[in-house]
Amino acid sequence: MKRIWMALLLAVLAAPSFAVIGTVDEVPAATLLLPYFEVDLDSADGVTTLMSINNASATAVLAHVVIWTDLSIHILDFNVYLTGYDVQSINLRDILVDGNLPITASAGQDPTDTISPKGPSSQDINFASCAGQLPYDNPALDATYLDHVQSALTGQASVVFFGGKCSGIDHGDRIARGYITVDAVNNCAQDFPQDIGYFGAGGTGSATNQNVLWGDYFYVNPGQNFAQGETLVHIEADSTLGAGNYTFYHRYVSAANGEDNREGLGNVFAVRYINGGVFSGGSDLLTWRDSKYPELPFSCALAFPSHFPLGQEQVVVFDEEENYEVPEGCQISPCPPTEGIVPFPWEAQRTEVGSSELPTTFSFGWMFLNLNFSNGGLPQFDPLMQNWVSVVMDADGRFSVGFDAIQLGNVTDGDVTNNPTIDVF
């Protein structure tokens, strides 16, 4: 009987999940996005971020992981080998503090099947390109490289790799901030999405169109005794997506032809907030945004590149009796320092509801967020801008919750009229 149930389970897993391109639903995908992370570099009791990368298919697969700063400058990449139905858990503190990368290996680097053992129904094959790379010899990041990574993710100058330039925002603390992408690939790639050959139409580059990856993540703060979790953003590939589509990696692909084939994210959202009562810690919005430019390291004297901070089309805050407040926002680029609120200025951030960045006098309700913004990037899709929004609510030392915002609009079809606002008086 056990074998019968296992056969039925595997049959279900082998069947393709129902998915609609341009909705960013929670189904196996070719790219995963951890929209925001935090890691306290000095305290083991401080905040850290955990994530998992999982394989939904029986076929072995390679995943290429890229760590980006909160201004979308890549600072580290590595590969993870997954046997069929495999799971790889990662604590970002292990990487960013200790310099240790996940230990995995394909069959050619693991002939005794002790590093990445396979199950009875899982494929385990050799990726010859991984020879000399996998498994990593930890600590894989030496002191020089680790200093570069930590400096980049805390807004400090990186002398060795970036010539003394900066690549992130200096928040005045030792919390590493940024985001992570994970792509299905067909070799142990050592390049980034903007490199020639990383993408090819129909999944013919290093990155493939295998919609088999899924995962989740947790923010854990031992010192404050709480954790929140959510699924990663699952970004599907579809070979029919091209030049007329605002794809996820559109700002990077050659000649802006959409050859990454990845669906775009949302531009308009609805999200609940609680700013009082038992949730004494309030609500924070965690956002990822696409500046629509391939970012480069910049002079630390500038604080950030010229087209930041990022503004938005409209923010409307409702209470539970449909009363509303409309914080004045910024609609030109770059946002003048005195031009209304700028709650989501960077590519990845945490914003406290009720703070000066996102003010409201209400305690409970929901927010309408139209995060379209014209800044000169990807002019063929102006004013569309893709984003992701989540919310975390907590009561310090007692309990916490986290969940994704509701997506009201999506940029994939490239329809520039997709710019809804709420009539306010």
Locate each region found by the language model.
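Beta-strand-rich interaction surfaces with strong enrichment in secreted/lumenal proteins
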Residues: 21, 77-80
